A protein has these predicted regions:
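Flavin-dependent oxidoreductase catalytic cores
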Residues: 1-241, 245, 250, 257, ...
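Ser/Thr/Pro/Gly-rich low-complexity, intrinsically disordered segments
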Residues: 259-261, 274-277, 290, 294
Length: 305
C-alpha cells in the first residue's frame, strides 16, 4: 500500500471503520534509522488499533525499527515479506526474503527482544517456481519457531522476474485453499488472508476458514466498503451515515505551517471526494471556505450509495 495508507488516509478510513486494524505504508528500517523517524512514525491516537509495517533484512535495524515503533505506540509491528518490486528486492527485503526464511526468523527474534508489541509477518504463498504448499508451510514453521504467531498471507505467488508489482497483484492466480490448509494444519496460529477480497459475501466465506481478512486495494477503490463490513452482520456496529462532515475532512487537508501542501495531498481522498469540494488541495482559500452546514451533501454524495 505504498503511497496510500499514510496517516491522513488512515484517519479517513478510521472514520468509516471504527474497528478495523489499520496498517501503515511499508517503512524501511533503514529510513527509520537514518531519516527523520518521528515524521515517519507519528500518527493520530484515533487510528488505534494500528500496525507499523517495516521492511528490511538486517536484524539490528529491524530491532531498532520495532523499538521505535513501540515507543510511538503502535499496536503491532509487521514485517513485509510480500512486496515484489525490483526496488525492494535490491534492498534485500520484501517477497524475495521468502527464499531466506532464516534471515526473516533472525529479524523476528531480534525485534521481539526489543518490545512486547506483537511482531507479525506478511507474506505471499510462494515466489517464482517455489509455488507449493510445502514451501509455504516450511517458511511459516520457521517463523513460528522464532516466535511469530500471526501471519497475513497474500494468496498469490510473487513472480520476481517478469512481472511488475502491479501485475503481481492480479496476474498470479489466487489460491485461497492453500491459506485455508495452513490454518487447518496450524490451528494455534492466527492466519489472515489477503488478496482479491471485494465483497461482503467473500469475507463471510473466507472467515469460515481463517481468522481474518486483510482488505487492500478495495479499501482505496471503495473506502465505504469498510463501513459496510462494520455493519455486517446487521446491527453489529453502526457507522454514522454522515460521518464525513466537511468539518471532519478539513483537518486532513489543513496544511501545517511548516509542511509543504504536497505532503498532505497526494491521492488519498481522490476516489471518494467531490472534486469541487477539495480542488486538488491547491490552497487554504478552498479549505477555509468550507462550511459544514453548506457542504455536507457534497461530502456525502460520493459515499452514500
Amino acid at each position: 500500500m505504498m503511497d496510500w495508507t499514510d496517516r491522513h488516509c488512515r484517519y479517513f478510513l478510521r472514520l468509516l471503520s471504527p474497528g478495523a486494524m489499520l496498517y501503515t505504508e511499508m517503512v524501511t528500517a533503514a529510513a527509520i534509522h537514518h531519516g527523520d523517524y518521528a515524521a515517519l512514525l507519528e500518527f493520530d491516537a484515533s487510528e488505534h488499533p494500528v500496525a507499523l509495517q517495516a521492511g528490511g533484512s538486517d536484524p539490528a535495524l529491524m530491532a531498532e525499527a520495532a523499538r521505535r515503533g513501540a515507543r510511538f505506540g503502535y499496536d503491532e509491528i509487521n514485517i513485509n515479506v510480500g512486496c515484489p518490486s525490483d526496488r525492494v528486492q535490491s534492498g534485500q527485503f520484501g517477497a524475495c526474503l521468502m527464499a531466506r526464511p532464516e534471515v526473516v526468523a533472525d529479524c523476528v527474534r531480534a525485534m521481539q527482544a526489543e518490545t512486547d508489541v506483537p511482531v507479525t509477518v506478511k507474506t505471499r504463498i510462494g515466489i517464482d517456481d517455489e509455488d507449493s504448499y510445502a514451501f509455504l508451510k516450511e517458511f511459516v514453521d520457521i517463523q513460528n519457531e522464532a516466535g511469530c504467531q500471526k501471519f497475513i498471507v497474500h494468496a498469490r505467488v510473487a513472480i520476481l522476474e517478469g512481472l511488475s508489482p502491479r501485475e503481481n497483484r492480479s496476474v498470479p492466480p489466487l489460491k485461497y485453499e492453500r491459506v485455508f490448509q495452513l490454518k487447518r494444519d496450524l490451528p494455534e496460529l492466527e492466519i489472515i488472508l489477503n488478496g482479491g477480497i471485494t465483497t461482503v459475501e467473500q469475507v463471510d466465506e473466507v472467515l469460515e476458514n481463517v481468522d481474518g481478512v486483510m482488505i487492500g486495494r478495495q479499501a482505496y477503490h471503495d473506502p465505504y466498503f469498510l463501513a459496510h463490513l462494520e455493519q455486517h452482520p446487521p446491527g453489529v456496529r453502526q457507522v454514522e451515515p454522515d460521518v464525513l462532515h466537511a468539518h471532519e475532512v478539513k483537518p486532513l487537508a489543513k496544511k501545517p505551517p511548516d509542511q509543504p501542501i504536497e505532503v498532505v495531498g497526494r491521492r488519498k481522498l481522490a476516489p471518494v471526494t467531490d472534486a469541487a469540494m477539495i480542488p486538488r488541495y491547491s490552497g487554504h482559500n478552498h479549505l477555509d471556505a468550507l462550511d459544514p452546514s453548506e457542504n455536507r451533501d457534497q461530502v456525502r454524495e460520493p459515499l452514500v450509495r
